[in-house]
Amino acid sequence: MDSSGGFQKHTCGHALLLLLLLLAGGAEAFRICAFNAQRLTLAKVAREYVMDTLVRILARCDITVLQEVVDSTGSAIPLLLRELNRFDGSGPYSSLSSPLLGRGAYKEKYAYIYRSHRTQVLNFYLYPDEDDLFAREPFVGQFSLPSKVLPSLVLVPLHTTPKAVEPELKALYEVFLDVSQRWQSEDVILLGDFNADCASLTKKRLDELVLRTQAGFHWAVADGVDTTVRASTHCTYDRIVLHGERLQSLLRNAGAFDFPQSFGLTEEEALNISDHYPVEVELSRAVHRIQPLSLATLLLSLLLLLLSPQLGLAA
């Protein structure tokens, strides 16, 4: 009897289990984020430590909606995308940006940054704000999901102006109705810097909004979650609201990402990035297909299989 046989079988089992885990990367969550990047310009992203931090934030998400992109050159997002695609192999990433939006000289754009091997843009449009209800009308996007449960969803980003939070959030319900009818989709995420707290909107007025009273809407980033960087403030300005039974059934987690704490930044350092935390939702069971493996992982797996007999890993 080979006294090492048990060891060989045990080791072989671990090796095969490791390989199966590598191949079964499809069980991971799908993360959707919204981030007010605070006056994002070409000069800002050209600062190395700002770029490095932004890339680390974006690399956590499958889709990020950036707000307050005020770059008039059109070069900031491509530069950010280039560095993101060089970062850690989690890409490739692509982007989709709105035109510059605003009533006066000050204008912003929305920008979607997304992992193009996990999701694709199916449709998009700028909400036709004929009555000028929004300072920055939503730039609506429909995205595919690698899911049999939920093959696509719609994102409706909004950065409200602090002087008109309540009327803009009332009008956001009309945008929801418009997109639901246009694309026959009930699975919709409303997200962004709503300024829906503190001095901008009282709790009483917030709770009177149709988006709060109408059945079917789930405010995933709950009241009381601090989405601001400054220690002197505690406001839930940034929100993510989910509509649709299938979409809500996939919700695994939601909240704000405290990037200063995660990355070891002081408040002063963090404020050079933004005065807002990103907010995010994670959808479980969203991904069902095998994720692409890196070349190094494939080579390591093949080497392990080829060397198993020599290493005594075979039973």
From Swiss-Prot:
PROSITE patterns reported in the protein's UniProt record: DNASE_I_2
Keyword DNA-binding: no
Pfam families (alphabetical): Exo_endo_phos
Positions of glycan attachment: 272
Active site as annotated: 108, 159
Example of a GO biological process term: DNA catabolic process
Annotated keywords: Disulfide bond, Endonuclease, Endoplasmic reticulum, Glycoprotein, Hydrolase, Nuclease, Signal
EC number: 3.1.21.-
Domain of life of the native organism: Eukaryota
Protein's UniProt keywords contain Disulfide bond: yes
Cellular location(s): Endoplasmic reticulum
Gene Ontology CC terms, in alphabetical order: endoplasmic reticulum; nucleus
Enzymatic class: hydrolase
Cysteines joined through disulfide linkages: 198-235
GO molecular function, one term: deoxyribonuclease I activity
Cleaved signal peptide residues: 1-29
UniProt family annotation: Belongs to the DNase I family.
Protein name (record): Deoxyribonuclease-1-like 1
Organism: Sus scrofa
Taxonomic lineage from the root: Eukaryota, Metazoa, Chordata, Craniata, Vertebrata
